[in-house]
Curated annotation (Swiss-Prot):
Protein name per UniProt: Phosphatidylserine decarboxylase proenzyme
Cofactor: pyruvate
Record PTM: Is synthesized initially as an inactive proenzyme. Formation of the active enzyme involves a self-maturation process in which the active site pyruvoyl group is generated from an internal serine residue via an autocatalytic post-translational modification. Two non-identical subunits are generated from the proenzyme in this reaction, and the pyruvate is formed at the N-terminus of the alpha chain, which is derived from the carboxyl end of the proenzyme.
Site (Cleavage (non-hydrolytic)): G225, S226
Pfam families cross-referenced by the UniProt entry: PS_Dcarbxylase (PF02666)
Membrane topology reported for the UniProt record: Peripheral membrane protein
Active site: D86 (charge relay system), H142 (charge relay system), S226 (charge relay system), S226 (schiff-base intermediate with substrate)
Keywords: Cell membrane, Decarboxylase, Lipid biosynthesis, Lipid metabolism, Lyase, Membrane, Phospholipid biosynthesis, Phospholipid metabolism, Pyruvate, Zymogen
Residue numbers bearing the Pyruvic acid (Ser) modification: S226
Subunit structure: Heterodimer of a large membrane-associated beta subunit and a small pyruvoyl-containing alpha subunit.
UniProt remark on cofactor binding: Binds 1 pyruvoyl group covalently per subunit.
GO terms for MF: phosphatidylserine decarboxylase activity
Amino acid sequence: MRRTLYRLMIELTNGRFTSYILRKFAQSRLSSIIIPSYAKVFQINQDEMEKGLKEYRTLHELFTRKLKEGKRSIDTDASSIVSPVDGVFADHGPIEDTKTFDIKGKRYSIVDMLGNEERATRYAGGTYMVIYLSPSHYHRIHSPLSGSVTERFVLGRKSYPVNAAGMEYGKEPLSKNYRSVTEVSSDGEHMALVKVGAMFVNSIELLHERDTVQKGEEMAYFTFGSTVVLLFEKDMIEVVQELKSGQELRLGEKIATRLAHK
């Protein structure tokens, strides 16, 4: 019953018009009025911001802010996979041979997440990792490894929340929400970086257009908090043992080891 009511409420409020109004407000000068309150409520670390709080003219500018030079360091070891974002480590685990994985009691299909069977097949038996970005986090997304970009594509239309309630009651938000996917080939092995849109504000802006990418290079940004899913081929990585669900991660921090480089 709770799940049904939750989904009904989301469907009634999560339309194009609502999203349009919220997006327009966030991009308007009027939104600057609530910036101080927003920064206080979400405890934004102002010491790391590229500009002072009063220099951001709109909420959108604050959402998509850059960091001061040198505030994040990228693990440069050739064997390391790094966190592509600042966020909360949600979960990791195996991708079954059926091209599915379980998180928070919900089964997700890689076929649904990536849009077709051919793309999903290469990740069967591999590993998934999920990182959640709250409204307080730095919203820019960077590459977790170096390699060649093999494909970029967008799927989905609406988005359910990706917070705890959304994960429990939503319609498989990680594989059904609006999402932008970048696949990267590195030394013959593939990784998919799935950028999942948040409710109301689906916008994911791609910044990287070249055929190659370097570890730590900026690739895109969210216009609000959301989630990143990383998919790796079978026998490609070993997740850092110390990582725990709920742990805060910082961009550039090592989260896994490339088995081919051990």
